[in-house]
Amino acid sequence: MTSQKRFIFEVEAAKEATDGNPSVGPVYRSTFAQNGFPNPIDGIQSCWDIFRTAVEKYPNNRMLGRREISNGKAGKYVWKTYKEVYDIVIKLGNSLRSCGIKEGEKCGIYGINCCEWIISMEACNAHGLYCVPLYDTLGAGAVEFIISHAEVSIAFVEEKKIPELFKTCPNSTKYMKTVVSFGGVKPEQKEEAEKLGLVIHSWDEFLKLGEGKQYELPIKKPSDICTIMYTSGTTGDPKGVMISNESIVTITTGVMHFLGNVNASLSEKDVYISYLPLAHVFDRAIEECIIQVGGSIGFWRGDVKLLIEDLGELKPSIFCAVPRVLDRVYTGLQQKLSGGGFFKKKVFDVAFSYKFGNMKKGQSHVAASPFCDKLVFNKVKQGLGGNVRIILSGAAPLASHIESFLRVVACCNVLQGYGLTESCAGTFATFPDELDMLGTVGPPVPNVDIRLESVPEMNYDALGSTPRGEICIRGKTLFSGYYKREDLTKEVFIDGWLHTGDVGEWQPNGSMKIIDRKKNIFKLAQGEYVAVENLENVYSQVEVIESIWVYGNSFESFLVAIANPAQQTLERWAVENGVNGDFNSICQNAKAKAFILGELVKTAKENKLKGFEIIKDVHLEPVAFDMERDLLTPTYKKKRPQLLKYYQNVIHEMYKTTKESLASGQ
């Protein structure tokens, strides 16, 4: 039976609390690493080696592709082979060196995923430069901070981003002297650059700088830093996470070993759609894996509305996503089902129940119902291009109802992973066809050790019958520290263990369930501790809520919340309950607010929340929390200090009116 399976084994015993240090649970490792962690392929010690050996093995394979635009219309994907890309990388590297850039200097890359992004990155890898992605989603303030903090001397920039980059001047020009466009440069931009003290080149212009010149490539050591990835963080300035060659080589080795053990190996036939930001370690790590096996990377056009069309043209076999993207896929499919008539919906429901039932009995998604796949679910598969064999979700937890739905209807392996920039992405991953792993992030990948550390102030006990505690990671994927912030490094890196700040719970089969966030805890006026992330997960079960931010502080005795209602669900309720007006006015309606508050309270009681954990007032916000207002990080985590600043007046008013109504006994 599946419940008897266990996918981890113990490598070190648990330790009781001593000298003020909390207790820690046993150290566990993936059963795929019974004979030790997998070793990298001979000759691969750096990111450059990953690319160089792929060029040697697969010179004529398609490597990088984009859609050709003719008369404003997108055509087929046009490809560059591994050898063609290599030749451009060498030229670009020669140009870098010819304008005085030396090993160890910092090179910024700013823009949407494209061929030039990867080529610039590989040129950095070739010459031992630190590749510093400049976040496309963070705005000029953060870009300016990163350029100055990392001391970026040259930046490769998407054409459209040149004006944004200029906004960082004059502060950034203390370090940044050269800018290279991924495309062309307008004459007025040349003039502006000159005034700012910058030299700016078009892509073709820059490639010519190194013509006829050759430079010896430096030796790259495993411990050398290859990239500094700045994490937006939910508080304060971005932190520069230093990632070594060894970290990336270790993660690619671990991913290959893991996929090989679950019969989902990557190969040179694989095609990957590149649309998640290369500035994030999730996409960077996956693309390194694709390059290592000689696979193909096709780039989207940069517009989420055109993503499905790009998928249809590219027909990828590997599709990585963040939960928000898969949520949209799920919602879109549900809407189509609702609008397709009673008969179609009934056929779908019967097929879904039948196939899901067989999968629960232990059948693989392929064997569970080939008939239903062909007749009912094939349209879903075609919607993703028709060839997808792996969907991998990462960056945030994927709701289990969406994961189970996709495992049935997408006709492919649906996996969920967990990792941090500091752990170079993958740390846990679910298995194909193991439904016991639904709602978890799976067991550890076979290149890390994991243990839980008790969090007494939150009543999480790593030695309890159901072990819960802060997830701690050990292994060669871990980062080399925060750039210029040894103080912050020491806070999270203790005795070789990375303290993630995430609270997890071991499942009987060795999977990990993320249940809370250690730092998102505060005390109410009466002295009760509130683990706010856990509460938000509970309140998010309310169907009419899309997103919710729960707030409290040590001066108040109760909680309030700002909620983004689900528009269609609330509008449907409004029609049924005689509430008129558009979505904005419905959100301001007292009857709608009372309805949603009632649903939140009902859910709180169903989940046996304590009295002080029940929300006393809610404000309905029609505009979803977004990055444009700096309320979310690029991985869609809530920026709590910024939310408080933005909604300060609303929060103040909610506390005032709720206290008045409580005082009057209403």
From Swiss-Prot:
GO BP terms in the entry: fatty acid metabolic process
Domain of life: Eukaryota
Enzyme Commission (EC) number: 6.2.1.3
Assigned keywords, A-Z: ATP-binding, Fatty acid metabolism, Ligase, Lipid metabolism, Magnesium, Nucleotide-binding
Sequence segments annotated as region (Fatty acid-binding): 495-519
Pfam families on file: AMP-binding (PF00501)
MF (Gene Ontology): ATP binding; long-chain fatty acid-CoA ligase activity
PROSITE patterns reported in the protein's UniProt record: AMP_BINDING
Cofactor(s) of this protein: Mg(2+)
CDD domains in the cross-refs: LC-FACS_euk
Cross-referenced InterPro entries: AMP-binding_CS, AMP-dep_synth/lig_dom, ANL_N_sf, LC-FACS_euk
Residues the entry annotates as binding ATP: 228-239
Family: Belongs to the ATP-dependent AMP-binding enzyme family.
Function as written in the Swiss-Prot or TrEMBL entry: Activation of long-chain fatty acids for both synthesis of cellular lipids, and degradation via beta-oxidation. Preferentially uses palmitate, palmitoleate, oleate and linoleate.
Protein name: Long chain acyl-CoA synthetase 5
